[in-house]
Amino acid sequence: MYKNLKENYPLYEVRTTESFRALLDEGAELFGDKAAFRFKVKGGEIKSVSYREFRDEVDAFGTGLYELGLGKAHIAVIGENCYGWARAYFTVLATEGVVIPIDKDLSDEETQYILDFSDAEAVICTKNSEAKLDRLLPSLPKLKTVICLGTPAEGEGRYAADALAEKGRELLAGGYPESTPAAVVY
């Protein structure tokens, strides 16, 4: 009645990886230009992002986060399911930070509790979740930075995710300035 799985089906080769960062690099190397994500953009057009492009976008966005001083921060991600949410989540995983995914449908009280208890210093949100965060910010003194996956509301500590990624791309393309110390040897 049942087949013996050990005899009839060989086990698949499994790769081990050292870190999430290494997993992104290996995916880009192994699958290169194959589609990692496909999603609809405004107008109904389907956009495809390859493994290599995704790794490069994660690198750029992560570099933008480091430029803001958030490379090792606790960062919450809240919003509806979209490519930007996935990019934000994977980016924080690939940095030295801690990601805090928050369900967009939680009440204000539950969201506030998670943001406070997790010591979140920044939140990456979709435009639809920004209004909820605006209501909660006065009661969250540790939360200093809001990064919007759309166009952010005006204000101190507000950034657009795409602008941060673009800044990260510029920094990655430019390399280190000659004035940046690389080593201090005595």
Task: Give a label for each model feature.
Residues S48-V49, Y159, Y176, A182:
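A broad, structural micro-motif
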Residues A94-A163, L172:
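Structural core segment of the AMP-binding/adenylate-forming
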Residues E45-S48, G62-L106:
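Conserved AMP-binding/adenylate-forming
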Residues M1-V49, E53-L68, F90, K142:
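N-lobe entry segment of adenylate-forming
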